[in-house]
């Protein structure tokens, strides 16, 4: 289960030998330009933080604590400042906040951003192991004169960085890096090879452009005077599956319900994408029951292409149309459902916007259709849970289970 939600944008820079305050207006303007490049990720609010050695900027899509949750968030301890810009969502905010309150911390917001900053101040750099969620964030620690970049375990939230004239730059998207004076985009040879050979995929850490790197999933970076260190706090491992079929069903059921329920926590209404497939139907069923318990009705959306009923052809990926299964779901669950449709001209016109949104070549009409439909859904809901990525996790694609594809020789 994956979500189309919580898309704030973060950006900034760091120079251990810098003195940004001497030219405050200039560097504040650079920070503003960087978050303006990310305004499509969140245009509810924006903010900047500037010290002698670092600058942080944030473009906010307000989901939690809409009134007092503006970023960057700045706190003090023993006369030293700590600042954070954050993109993501925690699913164990209350548990962490409870432990921190017992240790004497007082919260002035209900955001998970403040919880993360206090957790760092209290537990130290490895606090990230306690986080359950999706995130990319930067923390400035004035007590140690260091900047830290963190990324979630599987890389749901993007975070790129580069070095220009001895300065560290970071941002949610490469385009914001190129707002820094003197840094222009240039595709690297390795990046071009990957685009042509395995695109739209790319190897982890490859930013496609020259001198653009990506913080690896499950990693955090520490930048201080003359040093940069890369730390792994989580890594995927494999082990024999010894559970029985019944135990496996029970475990997967618990994990799905726990995951979806935790992601329903929001200060704005949550909806789901309902394609009629198994993945989105399970997410919708769990979300619908959650909403019913709270006396609310879930908004659901399904998407189709104009004249798909005429031109649809069965294939290995989609043996039959989804629409009949959407109707079956709606017979079983009471939701506020909206059918959305897209024609080929709209799909084509959104192609450039889709590439611009990702800064990389992508899945062509898959990306452009999703971007277009999301723009329609946003008129009703800011937060959407989807069934995206379930095929990757549960082996839903044909090459996971069809014998002739498993045994085929070839690359990729």
Walk through the language-model features, giving the residues of each:
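Short loop/turn hinge sites at secondary-structure boundaries
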Residues: 199, 359-361, 412
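Active-site adenylate/phosphate-handling loop in enzymes that bind or generate adenylated species
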Residues: 153, 347-350, 364, 371-412
């Amino acid at each position: 289960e994956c979500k189309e939600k919580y898309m704030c944008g973060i950006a900034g820079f760091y120079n251990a030998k810098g003195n940004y305050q001497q030219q405050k207006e200039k560097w504040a303007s650079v920070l503003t330009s960087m978050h303006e490049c990310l305004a499509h990720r969140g245009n509810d609010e924006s903010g900047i933080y500037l010290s002698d050695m670092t600058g942080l900027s944030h473009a906010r899509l307000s989901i939690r604590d809409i009134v007092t949750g503006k970023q960057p968030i700045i706190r003090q301890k023993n006369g030293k400042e700590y600042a954070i810009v954050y993109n993501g969502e925690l699913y164990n905010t209350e548990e962490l906040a409870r432990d921190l309150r017992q240790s004497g911390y007082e919260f002035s917001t209900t955001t998970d951003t403040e919880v993360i900053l206090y957790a760092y101040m209290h537990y130290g750099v490895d606090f990230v192991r306690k986080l359950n969620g999706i995130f990319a964030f930067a923390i400035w620690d004035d007590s140690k004169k260091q900047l830290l970049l963190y990324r979630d375990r599987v890389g749901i939230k993007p975070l790129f960085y580069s070095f220009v004239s001895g300065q560290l730059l970071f941002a949610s998207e490469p385009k914001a890096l190129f707002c820094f004076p003197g840094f222009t985009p240039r595709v690297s040879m390795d990046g071009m090879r990957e685009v042509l050979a395995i695109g739209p995929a790319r190897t982890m850490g490859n930013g496609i452009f020259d001198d653009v790197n990506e913080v690896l999933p499950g990693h955090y970076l520490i930048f201080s005077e003359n040093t940069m260190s890369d730390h792994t706090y989580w890594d995927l491992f494999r082990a024999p599956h010894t559970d029985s079929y019944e135990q496996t069903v029970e475990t997967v059921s618990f994990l799905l319900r726990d995951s979806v329920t935790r992601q329903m926590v929001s200060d704005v209404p949550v909806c789901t994408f309902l394609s009629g497939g198994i993945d989105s139907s399970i997410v919708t069923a769990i979300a619908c029951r959650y909403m019913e318990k709270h006396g609310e009705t879930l908004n659901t959306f399904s998407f189709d292409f104009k004249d798909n009923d005429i031109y649809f052809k069965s294939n290995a990926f989609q043996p039959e149309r989804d629409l009949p299964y959407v109707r079956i779901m709606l017979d079983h669950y009471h939701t506020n459902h909206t059918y959305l449709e897209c024609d080929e001209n709209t799909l084509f016109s959104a192609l450039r916007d889709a590439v611009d949104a990702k800064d990389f070549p992508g899945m062509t009409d898959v990306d452009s259709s999703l971007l277009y439909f999301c723009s329609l859904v946003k008129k009703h809901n800011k937060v959407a849970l989807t069934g995206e990525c379930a095929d990757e996790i549960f082996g839903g694609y044909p090459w996971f289970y069809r014998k002739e594809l498993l045994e085929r020789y070839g690359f990729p």
